[in-house]
Design a protein with these regions (language model features):
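Residue in the alpha/beta-hydrolase core beta-strand immediately N-terminal to the catalytic nucleophile
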Residues: 91-92, 115-117
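Alpha/beta-hydrolase fold nucleophile elbow
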Residues: 82-98, 102
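Short acidic, S/G/P-rich loop/turn micro-motifs used as interaction or catalytic elements
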Residues: 28-31, 60-61, 99, 123-126, ...
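C-terminal catalytic histidine-bearing segment of alpha/beta-hydrolase fold enzymes
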Residues: 193-206
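Alpha/beta-hydrolase active-site loop
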Residues: 61-89
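The feature captures the conserved acid-bearing segment of alpha/beta-hydrolase catalytic domains
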Residues: 13-16, 115, 125-196
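Short glycine-enriched nucleophile-adjacent loop
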Residues: 100-111, 116
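Short, surface-exposed "cap/lid" segments of acyl-processing enzymes
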Residues: 3-59
Length: 206
């Protein structure tokens, strides 16, 4: 396993001669320490000589702000990598659950990557994602929602996300996966090449 370098909130792991770069944003709460949560996945990517940058974060209600933060920190981390090894190809972005949404909301619209791998896309409302929130909102008579909302997110993807190469991975026994809705929004764009892959069993990412 390569040495882990932390640049801002990005955990960077570099082989000596990387052939490419994978930028990972994981799911809610399991991505506070992505270098641990996704250790097995990262190890396999490193074995194939990919540099891996994984963003550590604590989710909040403003997903657009977090998407912007991740994008800026990935850009900074890439600059450090290229100072060491020279120019490398555009990255492949990999998202898991909420991480898919954050990549899709990236302020560059996906233009500065070669594609996105979206594993188990999750775009539920706040009350569905946080059961305790639903109980509190009913008891205290208030409403709160993620920004952008699920409906707004799909519209933003259709109107502003420009990357045509997207691989959506759906696990057959995952009741929370919403990749079918994501694929529908992606396919509404001109020249889209997105594909959905359905797997029978959940592969451990740890």
């Amino acid at each position: 396993m390569s040495t882990i370098r932390r640049i801002s909130d990005v955990f960077c792991q570099w082989p000596s001669r990387p052939i490419g770069l994978i930028e990972i944003i994981g799911g809610s709460y399991i991505s506070i320490r992505p270098e641990v949560t996704y250790k097995r996945l990262i190890s396999r990517l490193l074995q194939r000589n990919f540099a891996v940058h994984s963003w550590g974060y604590i989710p909040n209600f403003d997903h657009q702000i977090q998407a912007n933060q991740a994008w800026k920190q990935f850009r900074l981390s890439r600059k450090f990598l290229e100072k060491r090894v020279g120019i490398i190809p555009k990255s492949i972005r990999l998202g898991h659950s909420l991480g898919c949404k954050l990549h899709l909301l990236s302020p560059d619209g996906g233009r500065n990557c070669n594609g996105l791998v979206a594993i188990s896309f999750n775009n539920f409302k706040a009350a569905q994602s946080i059961p305790m929130l639903k109980k509190m909102s009913q008891r205290l008579n208030f409403q709160t929602e993620f920004s952008p909302s699920p409906f707004e997110t799909l519209n933003l993807i259709t109107e502003h996300y420009e990357q045509i190469n997207n691989l959506l991975i759906k696990f057959k026994n995952d009741a929370l996966d919403q990749n079918n809705l994501l694929l529908k929004s992606l396919k509404e764009r001109h020249s889209d090449k997105s594909e959905l892959m359905q797997l029978m069993v959940i592969i451990s990412l740890q």
